[in-house]
Amino acid sequence: MERPYILHLLTPGHQVSPFDVNMAADAGYQMIAPYTAVGLDAIAGLTQDAIFSRGPKGAARTGIFVGGHDVLLAADMLERARKSMFPPFVVSLFADPSGSYTTAAALVACTEAALKKQDPAGLSGKRVLLLGGTGTVGRVAGVLCAQAGADVRLASRHGLASGQAAADETGRRFGTTLHGASSQTDDERRAELAAADVVMGVAAAGVQVMSEADRAIATRMKVAADVNAVPPEGLAGVGVMDDAKPLAGTGALAIGALAVGNVKYQVQHRMLVRMREAAKPVTFSFPDALTVAREVLAEKS
């Protein structure tokens, strides 16, 4: 009897994401086992249970997916799982907490592609402002932008101290330089907007972080990209279906939540399929997701 493809879904939360379960099933996993309230200290034991119970041949048909809501903890869990294995007992690993790794990758790839319509340098040397940037998608998108050569600001509506704390913590974990910013007051937010080449709306669903009045201040803005699909739009004037569409009243191109979401979906699907089909075990995190997002966009062009 041929061994089934098994995916173990691990989360520190109280439930796994139905989105991730559906994506795993559609990628061809035949058995999907959820594990909740998983702490970092439990990762080694769970990983070794998964690898030793199937032998080297069964390991090739076994995967571990790390979810949750904490992008830093997910990275630590992924690393702990990787270090808990040794040849020939190795399985494939993939972290995507709350879809943030693949969403951030899609957001950055779409932004980069839009920028390159105007400047071949893309994100390199650009000042990127992430409004709502202390959340899951904002932190990861900030790291990816910084790795591409951008000067990154994670803005918080709770003030500069909050933004700087998130920037320092995230930058330290992933080896990049990020800066904090405040969007707490109109004056603070508009000062940041006036200096930004790229503005990303990465706040919670249904929260507008750039108004029409704010937009008028952002005269340097080349791309406005929003991941909020719930009205009102996170960045005023950016429609959910916009895909590098001129943003009224500005010289910028607009990228909406569904344009990003379509790429995100394809990225997660492809990575799960590649994980299942891999001849040798793979470990996927957000830099890998950005590579796949660029592939998706290259196929569209």
Residue ranges: model-predicted function:
Residues 2-3, 230-301:
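Adenosine-phosphate binding glycine-rich loop
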Residues 94-113:
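A glycine-rich, Thr/Ser-enriched phosphate-binding loop motif common to dinucleotide/cofactor-binding enzymes
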Residues 104, 135-141, 163-164, 207-210, ...:
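Short glycine/serine/threonine-rich phosphate/pyrophosphate-binding segments
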Residues 176-254:
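Rossmann-like adenosine-cofactor binding region
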Residues 38-41, 72-76, 102, 106, ...:
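Conserved active-site and cofactor/substrate-binding residues in soluble primary-metabolism enzymes
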Residues 86-94, 124, 248-251:
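Glycine/charged-rich beta-loop-alpha catalytic/anionic-binding loops adjacent to active sites
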Residues 1-88, 288-301:
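N-terminal ligand-binding/catalytic initiation module
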Residues 113-198:
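Glycine-rich phosphate/diphosphate-binding loop of Rossmann-like nucleotide-binding domains
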